Amino acid sequence: SDWSSDVCSSDLASHALIFNEDLRKRFRIYMDAGELDMGHVFAFLSVEAAYSHGTEWLDQCLAYIQGNIDFVDEFLKKHAPKIKAIRPEASYLVWLDCRELELSQKDLNEFFVDKAHLALNDGEMFGKEGIGFMRLNVASPRCIIEKAMKQLADAYQLYIK
């Protein structure tokens, strides 16, 4: 077989902190059964490098994401004032409070997908408290965020205002 079609990422690494002993045991059984805890040497090296030398990159990354959050917040205030950005406290996911649009969740989803041509997380998938909300991932290049906001503003001007 052609090696390029059999790509396997060798630098995947993750951590699971599970304080509940019963849940931790069940997790361990699952991981062992699937041989999912078999680390690769490059994964270990990349984790070590990230923890040892990643501070500058992380600081730059967080500043960039904060800039995207600021951009979305200011853009919506100016171009789609009935949609409010809720600034995240510890992530790159911005909740969009769309309740002032007074749309059903179905109509809200149709507005974002069919009119703005955006695929965001439907707030209702997180429970009834999420009704009237959409969730936007801003851990993207600024040009992608700008394009998404322009699409949203264009749809807002045509269908909401």
Give the location of each predicted region:
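Short, small-residue-biased leader/transition segments that mark boundaries at the very start
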Residues: 2-9
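Alpha-helical elements of Rossmann-like donor-binding domains used by nucleotide-donor carbohydrate transfer enzymes
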Residues: 13, 45-49, 64, 71, ...
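Conserved glycine-rich beta-strand-loop-beta hairpin in the small C-terminal domain of fold type I
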Residues: 41-44, 48, 64-73, 85-98, ...
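PLP-dependent enzyme catalytic core of the Aspartate aminotransferase-like
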Residues: 104, 111-120, 126-161
